[in-house]
Amino acid sequence: MDIQNIKETIAMIEEQNFDIRTITMGISLLDCIDADIDKAAEKIYQKIVNKAGKLVEVGNEIGHELGIKIVNKRVSVTPIAIIGAATAADDYTPLALAMDRAAKEIGIDFIGGYSALVQKGYQKGDEILIKSMPKALAATERVCASVNVGSTKSGINMTAVRDMGETIKIMSKGDKWLNAKLVVFANAVEDNPFMAGAFHGVGEADTIINVGVSGPGVVKRALEKVRGESFDILAETIKKTAFKITRIGQLVGQMASERLNVEFGIVDLSLAPTPAIGDSVARVLEEMGLETVGTHGTTAALAMLNDAVKKGGVMAAERVGGLSGAFIPVSEDEGMIAAVNSGALNIEKLEAMTCVCSVGLDMIAIPEETPASTIAAMIADEAAIGVINQKTTAVRIIPMGKEGEQIEFGGLFGVAPVMRVNKASSADFIARGGQIPAPIHSFKN
């Protein structure tokens, strides 16, 4: 084995903020369906505790053995709207409480799956879940929610988009954490290990392990060694670095699945930043030659980074999936926060960047007076980007405070500067409701 590769791997862990961001166990709750919501809640609690009871212990063991920090151990479950639909209940909060109780029992920080898939319309459980979302998220500490409002095959459910704008607005009157735990998707994936948007798809195995890695600091350090070189060398350097990062994720996932006796799912190839210095996707883009993120060239730099990460990572993992690419959350990235505060980065540029990367408008604070119709229109724009380009896009926004203020979350969630939003109205557009049809290129059969 090449000694230089060993040295580089040690440096990744000790000096460059490399870590495994999450080991996420996906658990099917289809066998927990019951006409009695209280019985369903108890079944949900029991299954999560039985399946994931040793998840934290095993994750800590593996981290200690390999000398790698495994930051989060998490669980995702079948979209709760599917489970709740079998009951006569008009509020699914008891199911969220069961999830929360199980999460506390097994010692995980978040559990995802208080979710609904409504890309082509509402079923009985979907509307109930969305209406109960403000109450359910307020009543729980660790439950995360998501709603898929569009897909390339189905188009965009604009009625659901309107409803989600109103839901986010309602939740903004409560704790700042409520909207930090809600993601609105287009083309949501079934094997996402990252919160808050993780849920366990109905096409997945009963129980699986998915892994998400984090390595912006490692990529930046590698690029520092090729300053001034051509884009060809830049891309090759990112690919080689992504291979090393993903290889460790593959190893951790295999070890976890063997010890928990659970099928191994995927490694998510995403570069996930944190607010820590040296762990920023924005600083990687600036290392490519941009004075600051948000200037002209930012979208091209991000596109190349995203593509090179995928090309390098796909060779290192048995199976890849999830969101896979570079995350650009504002509050969770020290470089993004700095760019917003300097005036170099605005929501319009962030929207352009989402055309070429993994997710969307993520962890962005907007003024609290922003109307629900404007929030819905922002969701519609992101959904359109995803649907037309056959990729996952999402919105996680926090209406709070006044433009220019800083919303302090702390920990991995960081600080969100309140960003300017276009004040022109989209109300009549959003009021239409109905369905934006699927694009012509979605028709492939």
From Swiss-Prot:
Highest taxon in the source lineage: Bacteria
Pfam families, alphabetized: DUF711
Family annotation (SUPFAM superfamilies): PFL-like glycyl radical enzymes (SSF51998)
Family annotation (InterPro entries): UPF0210
Family: Belongs to the UPF0210 family.
Quaternary structure and partners: Homodimer.
UniProt-recorded name of the protein: UPF0210 protein LACR_1020
Organism: Lactococcus lactis subsp. cremoris (strain SK11)
